[in-house]
């Protein structure tokens, strides 16, 4: 009975895509995506279908078996619900492979880089281009994670418009989603097999069965959340520091909490994790600037609203941080918001702004000196912790 219950629960995670969804998936896989090179390197014109088939073929030739290939993230959400509010930014592909040693990690990286040679324009002398050169020219981000619970690597190919092609090679990973609406993965193998073997074009009456999975656990519930723009998750204590930024991104796109009572607990978890993962103010600044660049590159008007929402959440839900550190982060967010307004030339004129000043009580003290002598900033290290454990 236990096994039957487990099987039923697992089956709830999967769903068969309808024709409209398969059609959108076909469009995503066959759309030409430019990979922009640095310096004098030419732009590569690729499709997800071609890069997947090339990389998978070379991996198997090298002795690495690919269990399956999946479309992940916002692109998968776009396939399932076209106008879902999330857009279709990064094009995330997951290759499930075995990565038992460092040799496999290195082999995967070399295979991907060498695969890029296939997409160079005609006339380019490929013999003189090394994998290291290709990495410097076309790779925006290269990540390798090896822990007790996670073994995976990521190679992100550059796109100036923010539509990076991200190839993720996963042996094991503890958590693959933050919220139910970004928990979807679409298994591509049946469609890739169709491309390889079918002589007929894909159509409503002639297409393969394509399966989608929600890592949230309940596909129908997660699908309902995506359709109705609801925010929900499971085991929020497992969400990494970037979850706070994603949560604020959902709020600025008019998503709303599915459960108002649970959301404050969720916010406190995410704020605590953000400051644990990014304790230094410079780290926080880099993280925020990178997030804005990657997720709002063509949405300048939304940046300010996003930062104000993030500031409100940090201000209301931060419980594990010392007061001065919290104020420092709030000030950082405010300065970034001011910079966004300056870049958009919409800072209000001072003639239209009314400032209210309430003198502090100590001003009435006869010994109070209202002159301030500026001193250069003093750089010092902090030997004490900047966050406190939550109860």
Curated annotation (Swiss-Prot):
It comes from the Eukaryota. Changing residue 72 to H: Significantly increases polynucleotide adenylyltransferase activity. Changing residue 248 to A: Does not affect polynucleotide adenylyltransferase activity. Increases cell apoptosis. It holds the Pfam family NTP_transf_7. Disruption phenotype: Animals do not display major developmental phenotypes. They suffer from anemia with lower hemoglobin levels compared to controls. They have increased proliferation of B cells. It is found in: Nucleus; Cytoplasm; Cytoplasm, Cytoskeleton, Microtubule organizing center, Centrosome. Changing residue 268 to A: Significantly reduces polynucleotide adenylyltransferase activity. One of its GO terms (biological process) is negative regulation of cell differentiation. The keyword Transferase applies. The keyword RNA-binding applies. Expressed by splenocytes, expression is increased in activated splenocytes. GO terms for molecular function: poly(A) RNA polymerase activity; RNA binding. Its main location: nucleus. Keywords: Cytoplasm, Cytoskeleton, Nucleotidyltransferase, Nucleus, RNA-binding, Transferase. One of its GO terms (cellular component) is cytoplasm. It catalyses: RNA(n) + ATP = RNA(n)-3'-adenine ribonucleotide + diphosphate. Induction: In splenocytes, expression is highly induced after yctivation by IL4 and LPS. Its EC number is 2.7.7.19. Signal peptide: none annotated. Changing residue 74 to A: Loss of polynucleotide adenylyltransferase activity. Interacts with BCCIP and PABPC1; the interaction has no effect on TENT5C poly(A) polymerase function. Interacts with PLK4; this interaction leads to the TENT5C recruitment into the centrosome. Belongs to the TENT family. Catalyzes the transfer of one adenosine molecule from an ATP to an mRNA poly(A) tail bearing a 3'-OH terminal group and enhances mRNA stability and gene expression. Can also elongate RNA oligos ending with uridine molecule, provided that the sequence is adenosine-rich. Mainly targets mRNAs encoding endoplasmic reticulum-targeted protein. This is Terminal nucleotidyltransferase 5C. The gene is Tent5c.
């Amino acid at each position: 009975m236990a096994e039957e219950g487990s099987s039923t629960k697992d089956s709830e995670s999967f769903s068969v895509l309808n024709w409209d969804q398969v059609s959108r998936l076909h469009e995503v896989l066959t759309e030409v995506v430019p990979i922009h090179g640095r310096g004098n390197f030419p732009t590569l014109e690729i499709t997800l279908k071609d890069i997947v088939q090339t990389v998978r073929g070379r991996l198997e030739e090298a002795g690495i078996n690919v269990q399956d290939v999946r479309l992940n993230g916002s692109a998968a959400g776009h396939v399932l619900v076209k106008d879902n509010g999330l857009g279709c930014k990064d094009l995330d592909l997951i290759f499930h492979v075995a990565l038992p040693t460092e040799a496999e990690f290195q082999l995967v990286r070399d295979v991907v880089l060498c695969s890029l040679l296939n997409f160079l324009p005609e006339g380019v002398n490929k013999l003189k281009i090394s994998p290291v050169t290709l990495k410097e020219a076309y790779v925006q981000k290269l990540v390798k994670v090896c822990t007790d619970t996670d073994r995976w690597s990521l190679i992100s190919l550059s796109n100036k418009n923010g539509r990076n092609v991200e190839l993720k090679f996963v042996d094991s990973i503890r958590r693959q989603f933050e919220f139910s609406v970004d928990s979807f993965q679409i298994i591509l193998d049946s469609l890739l097999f169709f491309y390889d073997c079918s002589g007929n074009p894909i159509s409503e009456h002639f297409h393969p069965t394509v399966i989608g999975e929600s890592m949230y656990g309940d596909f129908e519930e997660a699908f309902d959340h995506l359709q109705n723009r609801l925010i929900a998750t499971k085991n929020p204590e497992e969400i990494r520091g970037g979850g706070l930024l994603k949560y604020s991104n959902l709020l600025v796109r008019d998503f709303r909490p599915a459960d108002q009572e649970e959301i404050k607990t969720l916010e406190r978890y995410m704020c605590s994790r953000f400051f644990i993962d990014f304790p230094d103010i410079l780290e926080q600044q880099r993280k925020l600037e990178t997030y804005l660049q990657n997720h709002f590159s063509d949405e300048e008007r939304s940046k300010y609203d996003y930062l104000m929402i993030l500031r409100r959440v940090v201000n209301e839900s931060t419980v594990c941080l010392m007061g001065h550190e919290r104020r420092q982060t709030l000030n950082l967010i405010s300065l970034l918001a001011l910079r966004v307004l300056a870049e958009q030339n919409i800072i209000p004129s001072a003639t239209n702004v009314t400032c209210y000043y309430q003198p502090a009580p100590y001003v009435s003290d006869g010994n109070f000196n209202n002159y301030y002598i500026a001193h250069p900033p003093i750089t010092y290290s902090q030997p004490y912790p900047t966050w406190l454990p939550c109860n």
